[in-house]
Every structure is written in structure tokens, then in C-alpha cells.
């Protein structure tokens, strides 16, 4: 039987959400780095008894709240997304169960059965953002695809986006007419010569 990726891709306004990261090791630092790289205005709190130097530097460069403590479910109050990165599987499962009871989306790092969402590879060029998922099967493949797209998408792609946005503002008609006009205007971008 053929398998497929049934995940629904969504782009979140992280500034409007409160993200909680549980753990202070390498994985927490990596998750924080990629979250802030994509959404530098994200509201983030990290709970851990210790933090790596790189995590401290990131927290100081951005508006990240550090709480020196072990996990307690009271830290879930007011949170919208939670990422569990501890090296203690029982704690990660506890975080997962606590989040599920509160209807909070949760990601237990490197444990797909305990993930409501994955943090895939992300390519950003100006206003263009592409997210890549392997359905949790191969983060390395997502990383390589991200590197590929970073290389092949031109740096000036944002100029195209801005120009099309300006053109869109000048189009007359109802929504369907505008879509048809834009589709006709942009089909040359993908036509094979």
C-alpha cells in the first residue's frame, strides 16, 4: 500500500502565540534557533534547570523568557504550542499528556507518535517562505531539500512578489476575475520552453 503525507501545512503568526520549550540542551537550542530564525518576533518561554551558552545568547538577542526549573504543568498556562526536548522520556510523555488534556498542540522532539506537529525544513527569501516535511520520517532529507531550494531560488524572488502585489492592486473585477487575470499573467513563470 502506498503511503502519503497527510499533514496539513499551515503558516502561523508566532508573534500572536506563546510558545513553551521544555529542556535546555542541544535539541532545545536547535528548536529555538530555527523558530527565531523564521519568526524573530515569536513569544517564547523556555523551562529547564540549565541552559547551554548558545541558548543563553539567543535568549538575550531576542525576547525569550528563561525559567530555571524542572517541568511543572503550571507552566502550560496561557501557552499555545509546546515543544518537549528533555533527555528524560518520562518527562516528555508527561508533557505530551498534560498538553493533550489542555488541548495544547505539542511536539515531543524525535518522537513522532507524540507530535501534533513537526518543525520541518524552512526556506525563506524575503516574503517567500517554503516549508518542507517528510512526515517525521527523515529530518535529514528535509534539511537537504531546504539546502537545495535555498540554492535554486533566486535572491531577488522578493522583487517578483512585490511587483505582482502592486500589479494585483490595479486589477479590476470580482475575485474570480482577478484570480484569472493573475493566473494568465503569471503562467509564463512555469511554462517550459
Predicted segment positions?
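ADP-ribose/adenylate-binding Rossmann-like module
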Residues: 81-87, 92-118
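NAD(P)-binding Rossmann-fold cofactor-contacting core
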Residues: 30, 38-58
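Glycine-rich, highly charged phosphate/nucleotide-binding loops
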Residues: 60-77
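An accessory alpha-helical subdomain
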Residues: 136-193
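Residue-level detector of alpha-helix initiation sites
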Residues: 26-27, 90, 136
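E1/E1-like adenylate-forming module used to activate ubiquitin-like modifiers
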Residues: 105-158
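Glycine-rich adenosine-cofactor-binding loop
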Residues: 10-33, 163-175
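A short, basic/flexible loop-to-alpha-helix module at the beginning of a structural domain
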Residues: 1-14, 119-120
